[in-house]
Amino acid sequence: MGSLSGLRLAAGSCFRLCERDVSSSLRLTRSSDLKRINGFCTKPQESPGAPSRTYNRVPLHKPTDWQKKILIWSGRFKKEDEIPETVSLEMLDAAKNKMRVKISYLMIALTVVGCIFMVIEGKKAAQRHETLTSLNLEKKARLKEEAAMKAKTE
């Protein structure tokens, strides 16, 4: 029985070694095809005539009239004449985010003002005894009278 467990142990370690060697010898290259590397440090062959592309430049965008207004309203520029011909997308995103925050603050302020206005109007209506209960009772009485008048005419 001892030799059987030793055989399993040897087979398992052999399998792990083979798996490690196979996975390290097959690697993806830049062109996404499998290439066999013999365990040495080999670099993929690149054509020497191919120009290397560098993407260090920030992509620029010509702003529309609406985007120019957003740049001015957000406080990035004072006048439309100061806005350059092309601006970075990050600058536009920052201006849009600033405008979103300003609009949300405005909406919060309008909501608070609306709530205060409704509280004041509700207190005035309560002083005039215009509650929902009294309004509903008056409406039901009026509907009953109309139904009685309609029944008399028929």
Swiss-Prot record:
- Record's keyword annotation contains Glycoprotein: no
Task: Show the stretches that span the lipid bilayer.
Answer: 103-120
The record's listing under InterPro entries reads: DUF1075 (IPR009432)
Any one GO CC term of the record = mitochondrion
Determine if Membrane is one of this entry's keywords.
yes
Spell out the disulfide connections.
Answer: none
On the tree of life, the source organism's domain of life is Eukaryota
From the Swiss-Prot or TrEMBL record, state where the protein is found: Mitochondrion membrane
UniProt membrane topology term: Single-pass membrane protein
Q: Where is this region: Required for proapoptotic activity?
A: 76-102
What keywords tag this UniProt record?
A: Apoptosis, Membrane, Mitochondrion, Transmembrane, Transmembrane helix
Q: Which GO terms describe its biological process?
A: cellular response to hypoxia; neuron apoptotic process; positive regulation of apoptotic process; positive regulation of release of cytochrome c from mitochondria
Induction statement: By 17-beta-estradiol. By hypoxia.
- Function comment: Proposed to be involved in regulation of apoptosis; the exact mechanism may differ between cell types/tissues. May be involved in hypoxia-induced cell death of transformed cells implicating cytochrome C release and caspase activation (such as CASP9) and inducing mitochondrial permeability transition. May be involved in hypoxia-induced cell death of neuronal cells probably by promoting release of AIFM1 from mitochondria to cytoplasm and its translocation to the nucleus; however, the involvement of caspases has been reported conflictingly.
Q: How does it assemble?
A: Interacts with HSP90AB1; HSP90AB1 is essential for FAM162A mitochondrial localization and pro-apoptotic activity. Interacts with VDAC2; the interaction is probably involved in inducing mitochondrial permeability transition.
The entry sums up its family as follows: Belongs to the UPF0389 family.
Q: What is this protein called?
A: Protein FAM162A
Q: Organism, per UniProt? A: Homo sapiens (Human)
Q: Give the classification, highest ranks.
A: Eukaryota, Metazoa, Chordata, Craniata, Vertebrata
